UniProtKB/Swiss-Prot annotation:
Cholesterol promotes the ATPase activity of ABCB10 in a dose-dependent manner. Residues 193-213, 311-313, 417-430 are mitochondrial intermembrane. ATP-dependent transporter located in the mitochondrial inner membrane that catalyzes the export of biliverdin from the mitochondrial matrix, and plays a crucial role in hemoglobin synthesis and antioxidative stress. Participates in the early step of the heme biosynthetic process during insertion of iron into protoporphyrin IX (PPIX). Involved in the stabilization of the iron transporter mitoferrin-1/SLC25A37. In addition may be involved in mitochondrial unfolded protein response (UPRmt) signaling pathway, although ABCB10 probably does not participate in peptide export from mitochondria. Changing N407A: Increased ATPase activity in the absence of biliverdin compared to WT. No increased ATPase activity in the presence of biliverdin. Increased ATPase activity in the absence of biliverdin compared to WT. The lineage of its organism: Eukaryota, Metazoa, Chordata, Craniata, Vertebrata. This is ATP-binding cassette sub-family B member 10, mitochondrial. It comes from Homo sapiens (Human). The chain crosses the membrane at residues 169-192, 214-236, 288-310, 314-333, 393-416, 431-452. Its EC number is 7.6.2.-. Its main location: mitochondrion.
Amino acid sequence: MRGPPAWPLRLLEPPSPAEPGRLLPVACVWAAASRVPGSLSPFTGLRPARLWGAGPALLWGVGAARRWRSGCRGGGPGASRGVLGLARLLGLWARGPGSCRCGAFAGPGAPRLPRARFPGGPAAAAWAGDEAWRRGPAAPPGDKGRLRPAAAGLPEARKLLGLAYPERRRLAAAVGFLTMSSVISMSAPFFLGKIIDVIYTNPTVDYSDNLTRLCLGLSAVFLCGAAANAIRVYLMQTSGQRIVNRLRTSLFSSILRQEVAFFDKTRTGELINRLSSDTALLGRSVTENLSDGLRAGAQASVGISMMFFVSPNLATFVLSVVPPVSIIAVIYGRYLRKLTKVTQDSLAQATQLAEERIGNVRTVRAFGKEMTEIEKYASKVDHVMQLARKEAFARAGFFGATGLSGNLIVLSVLYKGGLLMGSAHMTVGELSSFLMYAFWVGISIGGLSSFYSELMKGLGAGGRLWELLEREPKLPFNEGVILNEKSFQGALEFKNVHFAYPARPEVPIFQDFSLSIPSGSVTALVGPSGSGKSTVLSLLLRLYDPASGTISLDGHDIRQLNPVWLRSKIGTVSQEPILFSCSIAENIAYGADDPSSVTAEEIQRVAEVANAVAFIRNFPQGFNTVVGEKGVLLSGGQKQRIAIARALLKNPKILLLDEATSALDAENEYLVQEALDRLMDGRTVLVIAHRLSTIKNANMVAVLDQGKITEYGKHEELLSKPNGIYRKLMNKQSFISA
């Protein structure tokens, strides 16, 4: 799948912060002008007119107009007539239809995100598995797998908008309705100005019939604009929800595709924070913010254009202050973007601490460390609060400065407009239209200011997300050779393998490790603790690749095989099986290639073979019993038998087994061992042995010590070596006698 073309997204692309001369930074001026009360300009009565009604607003506006006229010099006779016309305008505006300001301040509510599907189906692969356009370059050879900043490429804003490409038709329709509603809304000041001129220049003419018809016509037009605005909001909100859904699912898919070494170095809490908090923050930038930002941008553009149409001189005078305010806006936006990234990093640390402590609450309770952990978490949250104070201080300074600039600009417009009226370069209707357009532009660019601020915060969080979305896993996910099923035997061989964990490259685990496991045989792997027995199983599953040497399956290097196919042929039962927080039936069905197609009869059959049916039927809900997080509601023996049933349902050719019967009581130990014996029948088995009976029944025993196989043979052969490591382990009673 190729990347999205740029043309449908340019309509949605915000101005770049690197171009201070463009429209966006003007938001600072008019946002503050529309928010900060106390201006003595007459047309600030437009705001109280909406709050208090026409009468008080009209009286207040007339009084302010008179105060303004008394301080105006050189206005001539036009000034007196102008302020009276302005007072009339305030009364008309206060009685105007409320739909004119529909949605000016109150944005749409936060959307609920639909539940994401697990990224395993064809639909997910279409956009998450094969989208080369959203991936960055491959990691360099020296990369250690940590999260790093995304590689330089497309601007992050365009990457963000690239997520909207599948919604291009809905967004294009929304932009069309947005244009319609904006044009209708922004045409009102022009026609109202013409009406004022008619009223002002012909006060004795009976114009009530014409005025009624005109107002009814404008009301119908406003209704059309309101309908278009409602459709625009619906289309933008539903599209935004889909975009966020796609973002979260794509991010989850990218996380699951990473190699295991990545998870060794990246904390789970950090990933959860990115999947929840960062996507929510970025989602607000795309959903709630994008719709209002587009509307505000369209209205601001039309409003500024009409200001130039009404009075180019006055519009040029007003916009001459844009460059210095733009510089302030750019500096503030960049600072806020960096601060947001640092804040999200700190929040991720707090989330990591909480996730780890809550997940291990039994250990915390056993050591009585509740208060200690509370203090640690409070310290992390306090650091987030300190960063929030910095953001609040920056926002206060920014909006305070731009608010002062906005009020000064309003005062300048009144002064300059009065001079133009006095010199007969403007009529009262034109000044009224200009002031109304300025008011609309102030509201619209106020929305753009908020949009810009939220966009910078979203991009700050987005930078963290692109690190994950663009990170290429070092091990292939679903690529490689698939062996012929008919000729597949399951013979395994390690040859001159050297390996160290990527998180600890200075500590070698294997040095010239070699081991051959014939097809259909049972090989017991024994050795002292920490000798690398569990690492052998990890290498066979290709969770890691060796630094040198080869691991082969039926003579094929497993690095050439498809990892998904390879793991589908291998079953595992670990010392401490991990179960999911769902029903017993769902945990058993997890071993199948397609869990949704597994029947209840198949689940019951493998449960019987695993000696699990008896205790399952004792539960009130039977196979529908929920086992709790990591199977915490089950005993060790019960979890072992469910894990064995899960492996039986998978029906693997190769079985990797880490015996864990030493922690079980005699009855559970017998039941688990009997189930394991059934599971091993007819398969190539590599077992980390803890039981003497398993070792005796194994075809071969391999003794692992200091990264090498030091002894290899049958139980009796190894026991006959008086100075051998195996004999020493037996003398220390390292194995269970049963």
